[in-house]
């Protein structure tokens, strides 16, 4: 019986599973899946033939991990905590950090089951179980990477950014930020929204599945996906009756990778009225 099949079968009877009743095979399978997510061997979502595919069985393994463990004491630098999920770096020493090749600034917190790639920097931030933060990415101060979220290469998550998770409330697919994106301070990308490669999200932009994404060049309104190379700011659209306006995200321009590499982020955002 494959690892996936064991997880799928266990999930169907998840209401019956507790730390005391879980059988050895199921526990071993769940722990192997979490270890695979932690090491980067597995990922909850990946791009296959140009389309994002969610491996639902791995998401189910994350959910099941909460069923098989009791709360226990988690040691912190200044205090103690009490939780079902251990911290990723609990057993790390200097040699292990050097081997992994990333920087972690206190009091950044990363749960076991999240993958952190080389050349990333974690300022005082939070990365939840099942998430993946790829190479060269900066997770800035007080940014949050939610459960199972996928953060690409060379991404900058600015201060206070929130990237939504899949566990609370339960979502079908993870939130995805593709390679070479910039997410401005205090912005929120949630509910499985995909921000495609090379996009720039300005400060204070909120995008969920029900958020209208208005392209001012075409007049088109879309939902749930920011096209590659978009520069996005917060805005509003008038109601049909014309008596009020409702929030939306506005694509003010498109840039290619060459332009993005030559022009600073601030310059792109300063010239949105051109």
Curated annotation (Swiss-Prot):
Classification via Pfam families: Hexapep_2 (PF14602), THDPS_N_2 (PF14805)
Q: What is its EC number?
A: 2.3.1.117
The record's catalysed reaction(s) read: (S)-2,3,4,5-tetrahydrodipicolinate + succinyl-CoA + H2O = (S)-2-succinylamino-6-oxoheptanedioate + CoA
Tell me the GO BP annotations in alphabetical order. diaminopimelate biosynthetic process; lysine biosynthetic process via diaminopimelate
| Domain of life according to the entry | Bacteria
Which SUPFAM superfamilies does its entry note?
Answer: Trimeric LpxA-like enzymes (SSF51161)
> Does this UniProt record's set of keywords contain Protein transport?
no
Keywords recorded for this protein, A-Z: Acyltransferase, Amino-acid biosynthesis, Cytoplasm, Diaminopimelate biosynthesis, Lysine biosynthesis, Repeat, Transferase
Q: Does the keyword Transferase apply?
A: yes
Sorted alphabetically, which NCBIfam families does this protein's record hold? Answer: dapD, PRK11830.1
Family from the record: Belongs to the transferase hexapeptide repeat family.
Q: Which HAMAP family match?
A: DapD
Kindly state the subunit structure of this protein. Answer: Homotrimer.
Identify this protein by name.
Answer: 2,3,4,5-tetrahydropyridine-2,6-dicarboxylate N-succinyltransferase
């Amino acid at each position: 019986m494959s690892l996936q099949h064991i997880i799928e079968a266990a999930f169907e009877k998840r209401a019956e599973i507790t730390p005391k009743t879980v059988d050895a095979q199921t526990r071993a399978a769940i722990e192997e899946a979490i270890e695979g997510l932690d090491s980067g061997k597995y990922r909850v979502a990946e791009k296959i033939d140009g389309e994002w595919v969610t491996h639902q069985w791995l998401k189910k393994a994350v959910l099941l991990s909460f069923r098989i463990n009791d709360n226990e004491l988690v040691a912190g630098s200044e205090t103690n905590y009490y939780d079902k999920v251990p911290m990723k770096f609990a057993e790390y020493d200097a040699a292990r950090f050097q081997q992994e090749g990333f920087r972690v600034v206190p009091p950044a917190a990363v749960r076991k089951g999240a993958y952190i790639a080389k050349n990333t920097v974690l300022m005082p931030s939070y990365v939840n179980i099942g998430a993946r933060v790829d190479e060269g990415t900066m997770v800035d101060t007080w940014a949050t990477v939610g459960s199972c979220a996928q953060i690409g290469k060379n991404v900058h998550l600015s201060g206070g950014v929130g990237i939504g998770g899949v566990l609370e409330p339960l979502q079908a697919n993870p939130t995805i930020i593709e390679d070479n994106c910039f997410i401005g301070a205090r912005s929120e990308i949630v509910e499985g929204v995909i921000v495609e490669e090379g996009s720039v999200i300005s400060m204070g932009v909120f995008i969920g599945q029900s958020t209208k994404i208005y392209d001012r060049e075409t007049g088109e309104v879309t939902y749930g996906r920011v096209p590659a190379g978009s520069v996005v700011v917060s805005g509003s659209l008038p109601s049909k009756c014309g008596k009020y306006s409702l929030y939306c995200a506005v694509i003010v321009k498109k840039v290619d990778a060459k332009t993005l590499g030559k022009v600073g982020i601030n310059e792109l955002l300063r010239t949105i009225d051109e």
